């Protein structure tokens, strides 16, 4: 969990139906991001086992994992690589604990139109906002969902991704942006989980961005390995996919 409302709500829902829950969250070394701290706080509050997933800082290990995600999992886009990177290590740790099911809040953002693009182009127009969500949830590539499914399949882990389910989509597709996000972002979720108000949940941030350092650490590793003067890792990812960088 990131300690945000999406992943925290699935924790609470799992507890509500009597499941045994172990909370995982990732971090680079002792750089504890706000997401990591919030996840730890959530586990503490509800007396759940908390498992820190320590991501590697070694350049060559990061690069080899990126290659695996591109070649074997099928990640093509920069965001998919960066988002799947921590899940690779999380799933490895799950297998050590013999946990069989991964429950995530992945793709929840698609219901709410909180990206910069969605806020500018869709939030004020109900029909455009509806089409944006229909397009988003008709494409398994959204939020790296298809690649996360593949990563779990390769590791024989069952994936439960409730926010991508049609039953959840149908709950909110006829609501406009303000009905979903006022008075707080993702209000239609938050109102049902008042027990999570103590987390003081921050506004939307992509998993790999913010203070997690995932995007910059992964990107800098491949740049350092293959093209030190490059300003972006995108070209390097493409060359790995084409086999230029074996």
Task: Describe every region a protein language model picked out.
Residues 1, 22-27, 52-54, 103-106, ...:
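Short beta-strand segments
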Residues 1-46:
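ATP-dependent adenylation/pyrophosphate-handling site
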Residues 10-14, 42, 86-90, 189-192:
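Structural preference for long, well-ordered alpha-helical segments in enzyme cores
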Residues 36-73, 104-106, 111:
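A conserved beta-strand->alpha-helix junction
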Residues 77-83:
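Short, flexible loop segments at the rims of nucleotide/cofactor-binding pockets, characterized by
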Residues 94-99:
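Glycine-rich phosphate-binding loop signature in dinucleotide/nucleotide-binding domains
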Residues 102, 107-127, 139-230:
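Mid-to-C-terminal catalytic subdomains of enzymes
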Residues 228-246:
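Acidic, carboxylate-rich catalytic segments that either coordinate divalent cations
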């Amino acid at each position: 969990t990131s300690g945000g409302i999406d992943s925290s709500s699935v924790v609470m829902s799992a507890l509500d139906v009597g499941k045994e829950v172990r909370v995982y969250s990732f971090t680079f070394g002792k750089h504890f991001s706000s997401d990591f701290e919030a996840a730890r706080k959530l586990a503490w509050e509800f007396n759940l086992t908390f498992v820190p997933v320590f991501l590697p800082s070694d350049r060559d290990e990061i690069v080899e994992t990126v290659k695996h995600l591109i070649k074997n999992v099928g990640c093509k886009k920069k965001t998919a690589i960066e988002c799947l990177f921590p899940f690779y290590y999380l799933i490895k740790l799950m297998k050590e604990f013999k946990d069989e099911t991964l429950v995530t809040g992945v793709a929840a953002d698609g219901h709410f139109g909180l990206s910069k693009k969605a806020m500018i182009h869709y939030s004020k127009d109900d029909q455009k906002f509806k089409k944006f969500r229909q397009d988003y949830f008709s494409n398994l590539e959204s939020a790296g969902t298809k690649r996360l499914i593949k990563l779990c399949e390769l590791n024989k882990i069952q994936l439960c991704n409730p926010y991508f389910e049609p039953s959840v989509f149908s709950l909110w597709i006829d609501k406009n942006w303000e009905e979903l996000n006022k008075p707080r972002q993702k209000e239609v979720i938050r109102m049902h989980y008042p027990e999570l108000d103590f987390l003081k949940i921050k506004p939307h941030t992509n998993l790999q961005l913010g203070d997690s350092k995932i995007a910059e650490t992964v990107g800098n590793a491949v740049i350092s390995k293959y093209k030190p003067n490059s300003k972006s890792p995108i070209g390097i990812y493409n060359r790995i996919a084409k086999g230029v960088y074996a």
